[in-house]
UniProtKB/Swiss-Prot annotation:
Pfam families: Ribosomal_L40e, ubiquitin. GO terms for biological process: cytoplasmic translation; modification-dependent protein catabolic process; protein modification process; protein ubiquitination; response to insecticide. InterPro entries: Ribosomal_eL40_dom, Ribosomal_eL40_sf, Ubiquitin-like_dom, Ubiquitin-like_domsf, Ubiquitin_CS, Ubiquitin_dom, Ubiquitin_ubiquitin-like. Keywords: ADP-ribosylation, Cytoplasm, Isopeptide bond, Methylation, Nucleus, Phosphoprotein, Ribonucleoprotein, Ribosomal protein, Ubl conjugation. Coiled coil: none annotated. This is Ubiquitin-ribosomal protein eL40 fusion protein. It comes from Homo sapiens. The modification Phosphoserine is found at residue 65. Residues 1-76 form the Ubiquitin-like domain. Changing residue 74 to G: No effect on ADP-ribosylation. The lineage of its organism: Eukaryota, Metazoa, Chordata, Craniata, Vertebrata. One of its GO terms (molecular function) is ubiquitin protein ligase binding.
Length: 128
């Protein structure tokens, strides 16, 4: 039977499979066509992520069904300079003592009307 695999770029891949094929086999066929390693592939059908050991018939995937291919996210270490920039952006803030608005680091007055644009500010507490 024929099924379709739609990638995030919008490209549609056509695969010839059997209902008894496992998800691993489908991922191997995608690797043959697209060169994406199976360990980086995630297949979605009807809002569910498909598990490697199961078959197409387990998920009731029939002829001309469309699977969605997304790539697995990889975690890692942030470069130190980017980490400092992110920390500066997220942590170096001033907080209004009346309305708790987050303001830029050099703020003198609050930008919110509800506290009367008070100048009663404090630095944001640092996370330990």
């Amino acid at each position: 039977m024929q099924i379709f695999v739609k990638t995030l770029t919008g490209k549609t891949i056509t695969l010839e499979v059997e209902p008894s094929d496992t998800i691993e086999n489908v991922k191997a066929k995608i690797q043959d066509k697209e060169g994406i390693p199976p360990d980086q592939q995630r297949l979605i059908f009807a809002g569910k992520q498909l598990e490697d050991g199961r078959t197409l018939s387990d998920y009731n995937i029939q002829k001309e069904s469309t699977l969605h291919l997304v790539l697995r996210l990889r975690g890692g270490i942030i470069e130190p300079s980017l980490r400092q920039l992110a920390q500066k952006y997220n942590c170096d803030k001033m907080i209004c003592r009346k309305c708790y608005a987050r303001l830029h680091p050099r703020a003198v007055n609050c930008r919110k009307k509800k506290c009367g644009h008070t100048n009663n500010l404090r630095p944001k507490k640092k996370v330990k």
